[in-house]
């Protein structure tokens, strides 16, 4: 999700400055935009978002001035790093992929006012919780069509994990309030 947000943000900012781009770069940016929109559609089954949502999330994450691209070299490098990390990820290493994307420095955190950071954390936790509830609902619907006992056990286990995670997130939200 983070890399999708970054790609959407960069593509949008680059296309706003179309007059500064040569034809080849413009075509690459358009290709990146098309690819990012395809990724948003793929992600939408887990986390329904629009192109605008992805850009807003990246702006919020970075707290950047959207009228300038002063940080373009840093953005480009981070985009390349995330892109390389995505190529190396596999579905079986979710913790590895989480650690790759959680590169928030203490300086970035200290620059966010405490109340605002708390609000951002609560908002994201509530969003995660609602998506987990949707996943739990989808898993409960999936149980109806299962004919294999191994798949049934796996779904029941995943529902339990999902419910326990929801409870932990709700408890965390209550402790932050």
Swiss-Prot record:
Coiled-coil features, chain-numbered ranges: none
Pfam families for this protein: Flu_C_NS2 (PF03555)
Chain location of the short sequence motif Nuclear export signal per the record: 91-100, 117-127
UniProt keyword list: Host nucleus, Host-virus interaction, Transport, Virion
InterPro entries: Flu_C_NS2
Disulfide-bonded cysteines: none
Localization: Virion; Host nucleus
GO CC annotations, alphabetized: host cell nucleus; virion component
Function in brief: Mediates the nuclear export of encapsidated genomic RNAs (ribonucleoproteins, RNPs). Acts as an adapter between viral RNPs complexes and the nuclear export machinery of the cell. Possesses no intrinsic RNA-binding activity, but includes a C-terminal M1-binding domain. This domain is believed to allow recognition of RNPs to which the M1 protein is bound.
Assembly behavior: Binds M1 protein. May interact with human nucleoporins and exportin XPO1/CRM1.
Name assigned to this protein: Nuclear export protein
Species: Influenza C virus (strain C/Great lakes/1167/1954)
């Amino acid at each position: 999700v983070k890399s999708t947000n970054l790609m959407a943000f960069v593509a949008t900012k680059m296309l706003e400055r179309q007059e500064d781009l040569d034809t080849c770069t413009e075509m690459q940016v358009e290709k990146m935009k098309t690819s990012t929109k395809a990724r948003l559609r793929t992600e939408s089954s887990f986390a329904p978002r629009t192109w605008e949502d992805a850009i807003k999330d990246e702006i919020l994450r970075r707290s950047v001035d959207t009228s300038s691209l002063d940080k373009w070299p840093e953005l480009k490098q981070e985009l390349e790093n995330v892109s390389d990390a995505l190529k190396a990820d596999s579905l079986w290493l979710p913790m590895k992929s989480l650690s790759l994307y959680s590169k928030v420095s203490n300086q970035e955190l200290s620059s966010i006012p405490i109340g605002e950071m708390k609000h951002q954390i609560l908002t994201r936790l509530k969003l995660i919780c609602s998506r987990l509830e949707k996943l739990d609902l989808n898993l409960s619907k999936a149980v109806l069509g299962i004919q294999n006992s191994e798949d049934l056990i796996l779904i029941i286990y995943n529902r339990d994990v999902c419910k326990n995670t929801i409870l932990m997130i709700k408890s965390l939200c209550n402790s932050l309030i």
